[in-house]
Amino acid sequence: MAGAGLVTIKRRIKSITSTQKITKAMGLIATSKLRKVRKKLEANNKYCELFSSIVNELAMEAEQNNIYIKGNKSNKKLYIALNSDTGLCGGFNANVVNELNSIRSKEKEDFLLITMGQKGKMYFRRLNYNIESEYIDIPDVPTIKETEDVVYKALELYRNGEIGEINIVFTKFISTIKQNVIVEKLLPLEVKKVEKRNFIVKFEPSADEMIEDIVELHLRQKLLNCIINSKVSEQSSRMTAMDGATKNANDLLDELNLQYNRERQTAITQEITEIVGGAEALK
C-alpha cells in the first residue's frame, strides 16, 4: 500500500513540475512583451495628449452645431470592447465583460458592439450581444494600421445616423499591480474650455473644413492609445498570473516532497520491522 502511495505522489510531483516549467516560461515571455509595449505606450501617451489638444482647439473654433460636436439625432450607442486574443491573463478579460454587462443592465436601449480580440468575440457571442463587427489577431505591439477598419466602420455608422455615440471600453494601465477598466467617449467630441490666452489660433482652411478629415485621425489615434494600454495591461496581468501560478506550484511541490519523504520513511520503517520480526521468529 505504501509503495502505491509513493508512486501516486511521485506522479503528481512530475506533473506539477512540468506545469511549473510552463508557467515560468510564460511569465518570462509576458515580462519581455510587457517591456516592449510599455515603451511604446510611454511615447504614444505624449503624442496622443498633444494631438488631443490640437483637436480641442479645432473643435472650439468650429461651428457648435457640427455633428461631431453637437451630435446627431440618434440615441443608439456604439461600444468598442478591447479584449485579448489569448487567455491565462487573470481577470483581464472578465473585467471588461463585467463592465459591459453592467452597462447593458442600465441602458434603456440596446446598443451596438464592436469587439477586438478573440476572447471578447467568444464571450460576447455567448452572451447574445448585438455585435456589429469583430476583429481578432491584434499584434502584441499594435500600430495605427490596426485602427483603420474599426474607425472606418464606427464613423460610417455615426455619419449615417445609425448611432449617436461612440464609446470604447478598455483596460487602462496604471502600474504593474493596478489596471482599471475605463469607458471613454470618443464621439461626439467633448470640447474642453481652456484658460484665457494672449494669442489667437487661426486655422487654414477653416476649422469646419478641417474637422471632417481630422476627426478620423483623432479617433484612430485615441483608439491606438487605448489598444496599447490594453496590451500593456494584458501582459502585466499575464505576468502576475503566471508568477502566482509558479509560486503556488512551488508551495505544492514542497508539500508533496514532504509527504513523499514521510511515506518513504514509513515504508522503510515497516520493512525493517518486518525483517526484525522475521528474524525473531526464526530463533
Curated annotation (Swiss-Prot):
Keywords: ATP synthesis, Cell membrane, CF(1), Hydrogen ion transport, Ion transport, Membrane, Transport. Produces ATP from ADP in the presence of a proton gradient across the membrane. The gamma chain is believed to be important in regulating ATPase activity and the flow of protons through the CF(0) complex. It is found in: Cell membrane. F-type ATPases have 2 components, CF(1) - the catalytic core - and CF(0) - the membrane proton channel. CF(1) has five subunits: alpha(3), beta(3), gamma(1), delta(1), epsilon(1). CF(0) has three main subunits: a, b and c. Its main location: membrane. Belongs to the ATPase gamma chain family. One of its GO terms (molecular function) is proton-transporting ATP synthase activity, rotational mechanism. It holds the Pfam family ATP-synt. One of its GO terms (biological process) is proton motive force-driven plasma membrane ATP synthesis. PROSITE patterns: ATPASE_GAMMA. One of its GO terms (cellular component) is proton-transporting ATP synthase complex. This is ATP synthase gamma chain. InterPro entries: ATP_synth_F1_ATPase_gsu (IPR035968), ATP_synth_F1_gsu (IPR000131), ATP_synth_F1_gsu_CS (IPR023632). The gene is atpG. CDD domains: F1-ATPase_gamma (cd12151). It is a peripheral membrane protein.
